[in-house]
């Protein structure tokens, strides 16, 4: 998916994957139905199974269009900002995990490490600040993802504040790219100070690094 305007050609799939019932995860492939259609195409549609994850790359630079907010709303971006050195590794046997088992691990993490009410209250405050200062908002979709993501991050050995730092930087602050940031450097500095007051001075590292990058590039 190394192409610009990912929200155009992947929009239908994104909408389908957000439907609550898996039996609704059907993608229209063809309008005409033939007797010799492939066996997995029924009535011109293909059923998407629950063991499929979509991973792809999109260009986001001066030569392409800006990535739409709804892409960041639905996906978790992983930035490739540095070049890794080549390395050799030993062959290791594969580990097979069923989708049911993986989903059970996710559910167990939510029971064992739920996001704290204190953190939810802080996120509500940040949301109100961002709405007032930048006319942007988290939205219910992102808040649901935070509730799902934070427990799994903690179960993997991280902390609550690290998980919130990552998800806010990747999903909320990315929306700032659509603003006229050249005229908002003072507001960005004030927001940095606000994060220090709300979460602590030595926390929210990814968010503050990204804000500094925005100020530098605009």
Model-derived regions: residue spans:
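C-terminal regulatory/interaction module of P-loop NTP-utilizing enzymes
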Residues: 1-218
């Amino acid at each position: 998916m190394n192409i610009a305007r990912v929200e155009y050609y992947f929009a239908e799939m994104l909408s389908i994957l957000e439907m609550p019932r898996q039996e609704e995860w059907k993608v229209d492939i063809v309008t005409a139905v033939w007797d010799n259609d492939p066996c997995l195409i029924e009535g011109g549609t293909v059923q998407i199974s629950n063991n499929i994850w979509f991973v792809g790359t999109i260009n986001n630079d001066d030569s392409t269009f800006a990535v739409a907010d709804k892409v960041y709303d639905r996906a978790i971006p992983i930035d490739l900002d540095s070049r890794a050195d080549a390395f050799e590794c030993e062959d290791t046997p594969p580990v097979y995990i069923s989708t049911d088992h993986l989903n059970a691990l996710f559910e167990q993490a939510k029971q064992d490490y739920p996001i704290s009410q204190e953190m939810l209250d802080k996120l509500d405050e940040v949301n109100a600040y961002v709405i007032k200062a930048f006319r942007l908002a988290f939205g219910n979709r992102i808040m649901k993802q935070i509730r799902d993501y934070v427990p799994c991050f903690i179960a993997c050995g991280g902390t609550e504040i690290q998980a919130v730092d990552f998800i806010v930087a990747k999903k909320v602050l990315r929306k700032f790219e659509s603003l006229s940031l050249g005229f908002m450097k003072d507001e960005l500095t004030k927001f940095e100070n606000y994060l220090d007051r709300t979460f602590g001075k030595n926390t929210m590292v990814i968010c503050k690094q990204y804000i500094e990058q925005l100020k530098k590039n605009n």
